[in-house]
Structure formats: structure tokens, C-alpha cells
């Protein structure tokens, strides 16, 4: 295996996980904050807000998992070798 390709794959895997987690992390923080504000304003709508929040958090977390899958593919099933 070419050491340059191996080093680039490790760097790309780290960047894939790091950059794929920035957006969902910010989005999850914002969504959770807005949900807490919504529940504080309308406590009777807590169940509906919480259900919607959990569903949206799952969709956002999927983006981070996709970045992890790309990183694992680069590390263990490298297509460039």
C-alpha cells in the first residue's frame, strides 16, 4: 500500500467524521433549545413537541452516522488501494 494514499485516507476519515458532525450538532442544539422554549410557552403541547423533536433529532443524527460510515469505508475498505 502506498504510504501517501494511506495517510490521505486517515486524514480524510478524520475530516469526514468531524465535518459531518458539525452541522447536525449545531442543528440538534438549536432544535432542543427551541423545543424547551416551546414547552415553556405551551406546557399542554409537551407531548406533540417532544415527539416531533425526537423524530427530527433522529434524522439529524443520521447525517453524522453517514459521515462515520464513509470514514470506516476509507479506513477498512479503501477503494483507492
From Swiss-Prot:
It comes from the Eukaryota. The chain crosses the membrane at residues 3-23, 57-77. SUPFAM superfamilies: F1F0 ATP synthase subunit C. Keywords: ATP synthesis, CF(0), Chloroplast, Hydrogen ion transport, Ion transport, Lipid-binding, Membrane, Plastid, Thylakoid, Transmembrane, Transmembrane helix, Transport. F(1)F(0) ATP synthase produces ATP from ADP in the presence of a proton or sodium gradient. F-type ATPases consist of two structural domains, F(1) containing the extramembraneous catalytic core and F(0) containing the membrane proton channel, linked together by a central stalk and a peripheral stalk. During catalysis, ATP synthesis in the catalytic domain of F(1) is coupled via a rotary mechanism of the central stalk subunits to proton translocation. In plastids the F-type ATPase is also known as CF(1)CF(0). GO terms for molecular function: lipid binding; proton-transporting ATP synthase activity, rotational mechanism. The keyword Nucleotide-binding does not apply. The keyword NAD does not apply. Belongs to the ATPase C chain family. The record marks 61 as: Reversibly protonated during proton transport. One of its GO terms (cellular component) is proton-transporting two-sector ATPase complex, proton-transporting domain. This is ATP synthase subunit c, chloroplastic. It is a multi-pass membrane protein. F-type ATPases have 2 components, F(1) - the catalytic core - and F(0) - the membrane proton channel. F(1) has five subunits: alpha(3), beta(3), gamma(1), delta(1), epsilon(1). F(0) has four main subunits: a(1), b(1), b'(1) and c(10-14). The alpha and beta chains form an alternating ring which encloses part of the gamma chain. F(1) is attached to F(0) by a central stalk formed by the gamma and epsilon chains, while a peripheral stalk is formed by the delta, b and b' chains. Its main location: plastid. It is found in: Plastid, Chloroplast thylakoid membrane.
Amino acid at each position: 500500500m502506498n504510504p501517501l494514499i494511506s495517510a490521505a485516507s486517515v486524514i480524510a476519515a478524520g475530516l469526514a467524521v468531524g465535518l459531518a458532525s458539525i452541522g447536525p450538532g449545531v442543528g440538534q442544539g438549536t432544535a432542543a433549545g427551541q423545543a424547551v422554549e416551546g414547552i415553556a410557552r405551551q406546557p399542554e403541547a409537551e407531548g406533540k413537541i417532544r415527539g416531533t423533536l425526537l423524530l427530527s433529532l433522529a434524522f439529524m443524527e443520521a447525517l453524522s452516522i453517514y459521515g462515520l460510515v464513509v470514514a470506516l469505508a476509507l479506513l477498512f475498505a479503501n477503494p483507492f488501494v
